[in-house]
């Protein structure tokens, strides 16, 4: 029997879900988020370090919130959450969990609206999304990647418990060029959770941080 919200691979539709933390709600994006998403993505930092289009138009925001994000849930490949404040509903940012080629491996990505940075919101959201990935998606490995030099993203990943694993050359294609990336990963044991398959660390490699 599947845990509540876990994907049924005989029926690949993943029912959208809302996650909650002490200060935040992580809920699926919808058309109502287009205006705030468009405003947030005018920030040069988001356009520089993420793969969002630049310039970022209202049509881009409508496509992301109204079509691409819902479709990701429907085809069980991409789970984008709007991160909002519990008290006011204000959009703090986005956290997305995407499936990778290797079974049980997913990748997390995120951005934070400029006015909400420096308060720990994104770290809080990433931790919750990671826990959900392990318990509901049956993930055995959650990867984080960012272009080399994206220090704020790296700081969030480290605070969320990711272990840095090194650099990858030419591993990101962004705005017409290939870029080098930093890579880190989180596994269920890092959060005190059991994985879906046994994990045998290599000699000299600790299973947990």
Locate predicted features.
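Generic detector of ordered secondary-structure context
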Residues: 67-68, 176
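Hydrophobic residues in alpha-helical segments
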Residues: 41, 50, 72-73
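A short helix-loop-beta-strand connector motif used in the catalytic cores of GNAT acetyltransferases and
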Residues: 68-82
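Acyl-donor (CoA/ACP) binding surface of acyl/acetyltransferases
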Residues: 1-47, 80-209
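Generic structural signal for well-ordered secondary structure
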Residues: 30, 39, 54-58, 76
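Conserved GNAT-fold acetyl-CoA-binding loop/helix
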Residues: 47-67
């Amino acid at each position: 029997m599947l845990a509540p919200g876990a994907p049924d691979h005989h029926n690949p539709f993943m029912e959208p879900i809302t996650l909650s933390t002490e200060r935040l709600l992580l809920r699926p994006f919808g058309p109502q988020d287009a205006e705030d998403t468009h405003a947030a993505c005018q920030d040069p930092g988001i356009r520089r370090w993420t793969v969002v289009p630049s310039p970022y138009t209202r049509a881009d925001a409508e496509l992301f919130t109204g079509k691409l994000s819902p479709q990701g849930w429907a085809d069980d490949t991409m789970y984008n959450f709007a991160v909002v404040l519990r008290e006011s509903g204000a959009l703090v940012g986005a956290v997305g969990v995407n499936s990778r080629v290797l079974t049980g491996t997913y990748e997390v990505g995120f951005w934070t609206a400029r006015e909400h940075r420096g308060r720990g919101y994104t770290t809080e959201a990433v931790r919750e999304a990671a826990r959900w990935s392990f318990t509901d998606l049956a993930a055995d490995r959650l990867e984080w990647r960012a272009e080399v030099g994206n220090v704020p993203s790296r700081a969030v990943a480290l605070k969320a418990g990711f272990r840095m694993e090194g650099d990858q050359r030419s591993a990101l294609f962004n705005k017409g060029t290939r870029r080098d990336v930093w890579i880190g990963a989180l596994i269920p044991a890092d959060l005190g959770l059991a994985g879906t398959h046994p994990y045998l660390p290599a000699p000299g490699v600790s299973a947990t941080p």
